[in-house]
Amino acid sequence: MRKIIHIDMDCYFAAVEMRDFPEYRGKPLAVGGSRVQRGVISTCNYEARKFGVRSAMATGYALKLCPNLILVPGRMQVYKEVSQQIRAIFSRYTELIEPLSLDEAYLDVSDCKLFKGSATLIAEAIRRDILAETGLTASAGVAPIKFLAKVASDLNKPNGQCVIPPDEVPEFVKSLSLRKIPGVGKVTAEKLSSLGLNTCADVQAYPKQELIARFGKFGAVLVERAHGIDERGISVSRERKSVGVETTLAQDIYTLEQCQQVMPGLIQELSSRLVRSAKGRQIHKQVVKLKFNDFKQTTIEHRSDEVSVVMFYELLSQAMARQEGRGIRLLGVSVGLAETKDTLSPLMVRETKQLDFVF
């Protein structure tokens, strides 16, 4: 039986800001956006959350909920440096580390001999080390499988931990809300609820083949999770699956021509990010994303093994066909990256005379 720990830093970006600027402590604080330009909240502290402010919320709406909200720009380089400190702490306990982002990771401590192999005590020690060396708090979940470790890390936040022993897994999952399962978002949860499925116990009692027929591969995964099954191991070399760039516009725009004026800057930035991040990997698709002023969004993609600037503009035209009179508040472009085993050649770009962008 494996011993998996999921470590999740508490309101990470905001916590770093409060550590470095004590005057922010005890006040509602959010990282991202500003009072004069539209944007999206990256994260916020617990004082801000009391007002209903949440990550990925539009800055303007967050300010309506909390007029005294302090907004600060992100300092990504600092967050990356602190994240490296935290990962160095992880490596004292195990080499099996799967970073999910700058502020969370899975650790497999099954073979760790410290604390007589107690995953509970190992998690406590990691959290103590993080606090002592970075001044930041972390929460932890301990379980025999990955998805339950992630669920558990959220149960005693902030600065706490939760342990789900192997013999308690069957009973624990019965009452677990399906919304807690990774991959079950608002829309999927509503579809499941319409079938009378709200907890893992509901899924356990539902015909498996019918779920698979309705939801495909995800239906099969859902059945496994509902029975407390997750055979995924720790992936120590997670590959980046995409590279993209997007911008939240200062004002809503409404026409294709206005969107086309935004595209050159996005494509140029995407070019720079590909050079830094793609490492010669093959692409397999191009994507254009629009978010409207009702906060709904649409994406259009095209399968391709080379980047075409012209195709981005064609995808933009297709996405605009879904506008339905709504204003556009965000525009983004991205490419999907093939797995390393599928890499055949460095990224190729089809150049055009009309658009002088070199990838």
From Swiss-Prot:
Please give the family membership noted in the entry: Belongs to the DNA polymerase type-Y family.
Q: Which UniProt keywords apply?
A: Cytoplasm, DNA damage, DNA repair, DNA replication, DNA-binding, DNA-directed DNA polymerase, Magnesium, Metal-binding, Mutator protein, Nucleotidyltransferase, Transferase
Q: Which cofactor does it need?
A: Mg(2+)
Record's InterPro entries?
Answer: DNA/RNA_pol_sf, DNA_pol_Y-fam_lit_finger_sf, DNA_pol_Y-fam_little_finger, DNA_polymerase-Y, DNApol_IV, IMS_HHH_1, Rev_trsase/Diguanyl_cyclase, UmuC
Active site at E104
**Example GO BP:** SOS response
Q: Which gene encodes it?
A: dinB
GO terms for cellular component: cytosol
Residues folding into a coiled coil are none
**What EC number(s) does this enzyme carry?**
2.7.7.7
The cofactor binding remark recorded in the entry reads: Binds 2 magnesium ions per subunit.
Q: Where in the cell is it found?
A: Cytoplasm
Domain UmuC: where?
4-185
Which positions bind Mg(2+)? D8, D103
The principal localisation class reads cytoplasm
Reactions catalysed, as given in the entry: DNA(n) + a 2'-deoxyribonucleoside 5'-triphosphate = DNA(n+1) + diphosphate
* Function field: Poorly processive, error-prone DNA polymerase involved in untargeted mutagenesis. Copies undamaged DNA at stalled replication forks, which arise in vivo from mismatched or misaligned primer ends. These misaligned primers can be extended by PolIV. Exhibits no 3'-5' exonuclease (proofreading) activity. May be involved in translesional synthesis, in conjunction with the beta clamp from PolIII.
Quote the protein name from its UniProt record.
Answer: DNA polymerase IV
The scientific name of the source species is Shewanella sp. (strain MR-4)
Identify the domain of life: Bacteria
- At what residues does the UniProt record annotate the site feature described as Substrate discrimination? F13
